[in-house]
Amino acid sequence: GEEKFFEATMSDSGVILLAPHIGNWEILAFYLCDEIKSTWLYQPPKFDLLDNLITKSRSRAGIVMTPTNRTGVSNVLSALNRGEVVGILPDQVPPIEGGKFSPFFGEPALTMTLVSKLVQRTPAKVFCGIAKRLPNGIGYKVVVEEAMDGIYSSKLEESLAALNETIEKSILTTVEQYSWEYKRFRKTSDGSRFY
């Protein structure tokens, strides 16, 4: 899948690279975007000192980090309009106003609508990538695949379902490396506590 990803970066359409919490997304970003301009959305930590440290280390490969707020979304849209790569961690739990419930491994999960909205506003191609840890700490294997076709649907429900199916497919390649502690189901459609 890397070939198709790199081919897509040569067009002026922009590329959305989904990087679920599997293995190490920073390794994925450094590897795939080493010589490609890219902008990555991230959730800033509450402590400025920690934020500065994290941003500095993640930016050393020329990766632009932008926060998950209005400014960040605007930066991401601008990057796509310039034909650049945008990295998004699609399994982050959004605020209620930034998501809709969609099945994730058979359970309703609050799913970000951002990717679906970006796809409708730009001609960007969507890929999903992971950097799987190899046994005995010998390194990582980068795997990149095109997102499920349904992600391009103008129907939000279909697009969100395809987004979650894309994430599920990646998780199933290395279940033990997914960050299950992330509590993807912490917000429920009926307000009850899942955890």
Regions found by a protein language model. Name each.
Residues 1-14, 23:
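A short, well-structured juxtamembrane/interface segment
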Residues 9-11, 34-37, 71-195:
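Non-catalytic C-terminal accessory region of glycerolipid acyltransferases
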